[in-house]
UniProtKB/Swiss-Prot annotation:
GO terms for molecular function: ATP binding; ATP hydrolysis activity; proton-transporting ATP synthase activity, rotational mechanism. CDD domains: ATP-synt_F1_beta_C (cd18110), ATP-synt_F1_beta_N (cd18115), F1-ATPase_beta_CD (cd01133). This is ATP synthase subunit beta. It is found in: Cell membrane. It comes from Ruminiclostridium cellulolyticum (strain ATCC 35319 / DSM 5812 / JCM 6584 / H10) (Clostridium cellulolyticum). InterPro entries: AAA+_ATPase, ATP-synt_VA_C, ATP_synth_F1_bsu, ATPase_a/bsu_AS, ATPase_alpha/beta_chains, ATPase_F1/V1/A1_a/bsu_N, ATPase_F1/V1/A1_a/bsu_N_sf, ATPase_F1/V1/A1_a/bsu_nucl-bd. It comes from the Bacteria. F-type ATPases have 2 components, CF(1) - the catalytic core - and CF(0) - the membrane proton channel. CF(1) has five subunits: alpha(3), beta(3), gamma(1), delta(1), epsilon(1). CF(0) has three main subunits: a(1), b(2) and c(9-12). The alpha and beta chains form an alternating ring which encloses part of the gamma chain. CF(1) is attached to CF(0) by a central stalk formed by the gamma and epsilon chains, while a peripheral stalk is formed by the delta and b chains. The keyword Cell membrane applies.
Amino acid sequence: MAGSSGVIVQVIGPVLDIRFENGILPDIYNAIKIPADSGTVTAEVMQHLGNDTVRCVAMSSTDGLVRGMKAEDTGDAITVPVGKEVLGRIFNVLGEPVDKAGPVEPTAYLPIHREAPSLEEQRPSTEILETGIKVVDLLAPYAKGGKIGLFGGAGVGKTVLIMELIRNIATEHGGYSIFTGVGERTREGNDLWHDMNDSGVIEKTAMVFGQMNEPPGARMRVGLTGLTMAEYFRDQMGQDVLLFIDNIFRFVQAGSEVSALLGRIPSAVGYQPTLATDVGALQERIASTNKGSITSVQAVYVPADDLTDPAPATTFAHLDATTVLSRDIVAMGIYPAVDPLESTSRILDPKVVGEEHYTIARKVQEILQRNKELQDIIAILGMDELPEEDKLTVFRARKIQRYLSQPFFVGEQFTGYKGKYVPIKETIRGFKEIIDGKMDNISEAAFYMKGTIEEVYEAAKEMEG
């Protein structure tokens, strides 16, 4: 019931205990407003303690809050703006614009806590989402409505890949994108905003940030804010939406920060005992339905490179595809620096992608794997000592590696190469010609930073001419 008022009885960091004397307790997940000198603080009800007290987690700093302060139950969960009006804007966890571009007058407001689509509404994701990026479409295709884990350290091109995906979905498919920065560095969010403005992608994108310096409550819920905006586009507008979450690990980390303060006994490695439930509640809402789909690309930080750590291990259970960015490939000057042997996809299956696509993808990986094995021999004995068959494999592998590079639209102003979108059919045809030996007499330099195979032929002619 809205209007029920209480009093703060305890403040421990971001966690507040509030007593409601009238015996009418707010529901779990209700938003509580606390007027303070520095502005209104919003908190979310997490637990009921006894008959008259609730334990809440604050969404902003609790500095200046003291016992005895009044608190009002809003009667509803945190609600955020949704609809076309959110595109091109930046929001915080509460759905308040933070880009100083004036207020937002949205189509509607929706609560951030919602049920996942029911089994009857869900549509299994066995359709490829064409990205126009050769290495992704061929070797680790994304499923419409699937979940993709993006593994990459600093400076390997994670942000550029994200921006290119947003641009391609917006331009080629007319879809919308939501970018959610969970525990992001403010600087990175700022850079992304400026880059998106410069490349014109921002018009079809909404951005939601819960930065690294914000309390754990904000970082724990900002993922749900972005997801709620994406769900509206899927359910009410029938869109295929792209949802970026960077970084999903920090969502788990925020939960573990408040878990002990809420009185829960920690589980393995100090994580919250509700880890699987928390991750599942977010991931299960990201799905394809009869109306549209949400495809999510989630950056995954792996603590100390330990894939058995409970946080990444729990996330892996939900992923359909993994795109691994490699520093070794960056060192070769090949962008996007996707590792073709480490990246995987559940839908790289002849029943989904077709026999031809599957066979060519596996053959490409086979050639690259054999080339990797031969590198030690080449380093010791040199190329001349290899049998003819292995020499051919190495030459083809070098061409494949270079042909996996591709100029991006969002990088045009930096690289000088015109961006290329390559349909899947063209990608398959190009790699088939390399595997079949039709390109054996063409210099490997002709394959670097090209879109379709026709461009390789043209470059080869120019080199000869």
